[in-house]
UniProtKB/Swiss-Prot annotation:
Protein name: Ubiquitin carboxyl-terminal hydrolase 36
Annotated Low complexity bias: 121-138, 479-494, 561-580, 740-750, 963-974
Skewed-composition ranges (Polar residues): 23-45, 603-615, 673-702, 806-818, 833-853
Taxon lineage: Eukaryota, Metazoa, Ecdysozoa, Arthropoda, Hexapoda
Encoding gene per record: Usp36
Composition bias, Pro residues: 751-760
Domain called USP: residue spans: 168-457
Family, similarity comment: Belongs to the peptidase C19 family.
Disulfide feature: none
Annotated compartments: Nucleus, Nucleolus
Length: 1059
């Protein structure tokens, strides 16, 4: 045992020697005395003590055993001596001007750099409150007494012998969703639940059942046992009845804040635990923070503030039980932690310095709810924010999500609270008052989180908690850290597409004059300084990396969705690809079962490439060493939109195989696009490697020219080839580029003959293939002149299979017939012309099956717009052509443009131009066909008008009622406004009283007369229900509601037979 020497008679001698030495040193005013160093002062004191050594040695000495030499002797001696005036301003109590670390310490208590703070003066008031002053400002003060040892906290569900259940719901007794959700979140924290069930001795002696008395801890324990034992939802009346005891200003039945209730509930439980001790009011704050609630939820924040004016450094420790994170500038929980623990520059009037007397204002009140979604992971690593010893920094500090409180609602004044809690099996459940249902981890991470509870993950620790050499308290070893954060739910985080930027430097702090905050942990057996970790986020299963990233070392960078992508070194297996060219590739939903590697690299971020617009059903070759499994592609022919960059292929001979390059090697458009764009593309729903190092075979002999020059060249060549040839094969010309032809993979055609007019130029660019066509003459203004201009002999015009009823329905053209010399051109009044068709282009691998006048847009612009509500003009703001042209002219145009009645092509040698205009020997047949089409078109139009009149839209102008009478011969006999269905339902008698049954009166047709009798003054205003004036007005209203205009007179049956 350590021993101490009790000085009895020589105490006065020693005191006198000290006073004489100090008094002589202070009274000496010469320059030599002022120049004495600390060594001279110590030597003078030693000489005075040696002079009295004989008396001290001959004095009687008594010994006694003490438990601790430091506490019993040294502390008592320090309290007896007072420094009057030290010779050296930097020397205190005989210590030299060097501190424990060997750095020079100035008079103001910090070293020359102002980085560290010297020990407090022994006469300071804080020294008397804490009998164990520490010379290291980075170390927490040690409490005198520990109310609840940290080792008694059991973390995890499996640390208890009890079999934990999921737990039942809690009944909402009136705006108590905040109370139910907070209790569910607290009771699903394993450390708190294990402590509550361990209070069996106190629970037996507590009078919690009495109203208005008893501790809140026992009420929480009984509520926990009730949720574990019952099969149905419980009513938390033990907590609800003590609402006033928990917080005085909370009103029963009123909506309250869940976080506010959480704070008051934890404080009430702490007060209930402190009331078990007799002198709890005399305990200091450090002792009060060692309660079980403080050991589970508590921690310390170490703040270091440096004044830019006087360079004064202030280090403070602040106790916390939850972290309030600001998410206004954060997109994830990690970003919120970065912002909370990062350095910041305090503006003017931002901090109250001891010398400047300035104040700090850190928080601002916002009157609205933060409707911002942040992403979080089920595990977080706080190693970089923990101020621990170097030995403890090697151990990971990982916390796992155990429960949370969510808020549903757009405002902070109203809404609904729910809770999510974990079980011993690792699954999560959603607690919505009395409803309990399981929830997946993905939905948990996408939940609207308001308060989040994380508990230390012991599986990530390197050694058991009991065997740790340093006594770490609170958040570094055996406690939970609640992290409240107000968020709003949003769609699930999408996967990051594009290259990943390299991680930053090892030191995340760049501002030198700022405030630094870190989580502090108490050390019991060590007094060395603690350091603040500045590393980046690391994987929870690996220790954090120290220092900067080494060259060629495998590093990791987190992505937005939490999936870590590795970047291998230059000597890895993928040595065929440069590291600087590795990029992320887009992931398709069709290939979720394929394990793909995503390779980040230190390249700059680029926009994703345009999708491949010319995909065929051949499987592209992967030009990268990465093995990619491609599924069977589906043929999706598409066309490009805008040719940003183009290359000329006009003078290049068509290839026999559209998939074969001039070099003799097959390649796909997706490969070419992948090698020229930002390095990734999606082909048929499968993942292709599009790195810049992929070898793509491109014809190097192509001369790249401007797209505008190509367009003018194609227009010029099309103009030169307008003259007719004797032998022409019908083909289909691409006009708008929106109707590709379905062509098989193995299809190959010979190059076109020299007599065939060249097809329009095909421009191949990165965005796809463009075919440029030439528009004919400017559209002429439509008038009532001749419909057709006939030139030369008639030609075979291949038109799609269309009918006069539906001019937009089309099919494949019929079998070609031999062309006859002397082509006939037809120019209609609307400006569209039917030109001789050319040989299809086979070099680009697709064709079109639409004609020049068969454009869907052109047809839509000519249609009438009746029936679309109020009377409107056409899409371009002008009246429709059908409304301003004669009906016969419109029919003639349709006859000439869309073929015969049967939908087949017009026979050779005859062209229908009008009912009275022909130029062929078969004029009688043409007239018969034209007149038949004209009559049929008139009948169809009359039927359309009748349908419009029957099914006219009300447009809000006229009240519609159902009519039981059919329109026909007996339409005039119907009663206006009469609805038999409504009359039947209105006069129905449900009681079966009477002789003939329950509904006998409705079968004798008496209700029509009753309706007329009741409404005779309502509808008989014009001399009777069926008067001519009334019928004319009704017809006029129907006509005006249909859009106005007058329908043409329908031909009689005799006229139709004559025609």
């Amino acid at each position: 045992m350590p021993v101490s020497m009790a000085v009895c008679e020589t105490a006065n001698v020693v005191n006198a020697a000290l006073r004489e030495s100090l008094g002589g040193n202070s009274s000496a005013g010469s320059s030599t005395d002022q120049a004495k160093s600390g060594e001279d002062t110590n030597g003078s004191l030693q000489n005075h003590i040696v002079a009295n050594a004989k008396r001290i040695l001959m004095a009687k000495i008594e010994y006694e055993e003490v438990p601790n030499y430091h506490e019993s002797v040294l502390e008592n001696l320090k309290s007896k001596y007072i420094v009057i005036k030290p010779g050296n301003p930097g020397a205190i109590n005989g210590f030299s001007g060097k501190n424990n670390t060997g750095k020079l310490v100035g008079a103001n208590g910090h070293d020359n750099n102002g980085a560290r703070k010297q020990a407090e003066h022994p006469n300071n008031q804080s020294h008397h409150n804490h009998p164990h002053p520490t010379s290291n400002p980075n170390e927490l003060p040690k409490p005198k007494r520990v109310l609840y040892p940290r080792e008694n906290i059991r973390i995890g569900w499996k640390q208890s012998e009890r079999k934990w259940q999921v737990g039942t719901g809690m009944i909402n007794v009136g705006n108590t969703c905040y109370l139910n959700s907070t209790l569910q979140a607290l009771l699903h924290i394993p450390a708190l639940a294990n402590w509550l069930v361990s209070e069996q001795a106190h629970l037996a002696d507590c009078n919690v059942a009495e109203p208005g008395s008893g501790c809140i801890i026992c009420a929480m324990a009984k509520t926990l046992l009730a949720t574990q034992s019952n099969q149905s939802a419980v009513r938390p009346f033990l907590i609800y009845s003590k609402l006033k005891q928990i917080c005085k200003h909370m009103v029963v039945g009123r909506q309250e804040d869940a976080h506010e209730f959480l704070r008051f509930l934890v404080e009430a439980m702490e007060r209930a635990y402190l009331m078990r001790f007799r002198n709890y009011k005399e305990l200091d704050q450090l002792v009060k923070e060692t309660t079980p609630l403080g050991q589970i939820f508590g921690g310390y924040l170490r703040s270091e503030v440096r004044c830019l004016s006087c360079n004064h450094v202030s280090i403070t420790f602040q106790h916390f039980q939850d972290l309030l994170l600001d998410i206004r500038k954060a997109d994830s929980l990690e970003d919120a932690f970065e912002g909370h623990f990062s350095r910041e520059r305090l503006e003017d009037m931002g901090y109250k310095c001891e010398g400047c007397k300035k104040k700090l204002k850190r928080f601002s009140m916002i009157g609205n709810k933060l409707t911002k979604q942040i992403s979080f992971k089920p595990r977080i690593d706080l190693s970089k924010y923990a101020a621990r010893s170097p030995a403890a920094q090697a151990q990971p500090l990982t916390y796992r999500l155990v429960s949370m409180v969510t808020h549903l609602g757009a405002s902070q004044h109203c809404g609904h609270y729910t809770a999510i809690g974990s079980t011993d099996t690792g699954s999560f459940y959603n607690f919505d008052d009395s409803y309990v249902r399981p929830i997946t981890m993905q939905n948990v991470c996408n939940t609207n989180a308001y308060i989040m509870f994380f508990e230390l993950d012991l599986s990530q620790a390197a050694s058991p908690p009991a065997n740790r050499p340093n006594g770490v308290r609170l958040t570094n070893g055996h406690s939970t850290t609640p992290v409240p954060a107000a968020t709003v739910s949003s769609p699930s985080p999408t996967r990051f597409i594009g290259p990943q930027l390299p991680p930053g430097g090892a030191n995340g702090y760049t501002n030198g004059n700022a405030q630094k905050t870190a989580i502090q942990f108490k050390q019991q057996n060590q007094q060395n300084g603690l350091q603040l970790g500045t590393g980046k986020f690391q994987d929870t299963a690996k220790p954090p990396l120290v220092g900067a990233y080494a060259k060629g070392e495998a590093t990791s960078a987190p992505t937005a969705n939490g999936n870590k992508s590795s970047s291998p070194s230059s000597n890895s297996s993928s040595n065929h690809k440069s590291i600087n060219q590795q990029q992320y590739l887009p992931i398709s939903s069709d290939d979720e079962d394929i394990d793909d590697e995503m390779k980040p690299g230190p390249t700059t971020a680029q926009l994703p490439s345009m999708p491949n617009m010319t995909e065929d059903n051949t499987e592209p070759k992967a030009k990268s060493p990465v093995k990619i499994h491609l599924k069977t592609p589906v043929k999706t022919p598409l066309k490009s939109l805008v040719p940003y960059e183009s290359a000329s292929e006009e003078e290049e001979a068509p290839l026999p195989n559209p998939r074969q390059s001039p070099g003799g090697e097959d390649f796909s458009e997706s490969d070419q696009e992948s090698g020229q764009t930002n390095g990734h593309s999606k082909t048929n729903g499968s993942l292709t490697n599009g790195s810049a190092s992929s070898s793509v075979h491109v014809n190097n002999s192509k001369q790249k020219t401007d797209a505008i020059d190509e367009i003018f060249k194609s227009l010029k060549k099309s103009a030169d080839s307008e003259e007719d040839d004797d032998e022409e094969e019908p083909s289909i010309q691409l006009t708008n580029g929106w109707h590709p032809q379905k062509q098989s993979q193995s299809q190959s055609k010979a190059p076109p003959s020299p007599k065939t007019p060249p097809s329009p130029a095909v421009i191949k660019s990165k965005t796809g293939i463009w075919k440029v066509t030439r528009k004919d003459e400017v559209d002429a203004i439509d008038d009532d002149d001749d419909a057709v201009v006939v030139e030369g002999a008639p030609v075979k015009i291949p038109t799609p299979n269309k009918t006069h009823r539906n001019p937009f329905s089309s099919s494949k053209p019929s079998t070609d017939s031999p062309a006859t010399p002397g082509a006939k051109r037809q120019k209609l009044l609307n400006g569209s012309a039917l030109k001789s068709h050319q040989q299809p282009r086979v070099g680009n691998g697709y064709q079109s099956n639409v004609t020049s006048n068969g454009s869907t847009v052109n047809e839509l612009l000519k249609q009438s717009y009746r029936g679309y509500g109020a009377s409107v003009l056409s899409w371009n703001g002008k009246p429709a052509e059908l409304e301003k042209e004669p009906f016969e002219l419109v029919c003639a145009k349709r006859i000439a443009g869309h073929g015969s009645v049967e939908g087949s092509d017009i026979v050779e040698g005859s062209v229908a131009v009008d009912a009275a205009v022909t130029s062929s020997s078969n004029s009688n047949d043409v007239v018969v066909i034209a007149v038949a089409l004209l009559v049929d078109a008139r009948e169809q139009r009359q039927r359309d008008l009748d349908d419009d009149e029957e099914n006219e839209m009300d447009r809000g102008r006229q009240r519609k009622v159902k009519s039981g009478s059919a329109k026909g011969n007996n339409a005039s006999n119907s009663t206006p406004g009469y609805n038999p269905f409504q009359e039947y339902e209105g006069q129905k008698r449900w009681n079966k009283n009477g002789g003939g049954g329950g509904f006998s009166r409705f079968y004798n047709q008496n209700y029509r007369q009753n309706f007329q009798q009741r409404n005779k003054f309502k509808f008989n205003r014009f001399g009777g229900a069926g008067s001519a004036k009334f019928q004319q007005q009704r017809a006029l209203q129907r006509h005006l509601s249909a859009g106005g205009g007058f329908s043409r007179r329908q031909p009689s049956a005799q006229q139709q037979q004559q025609t």
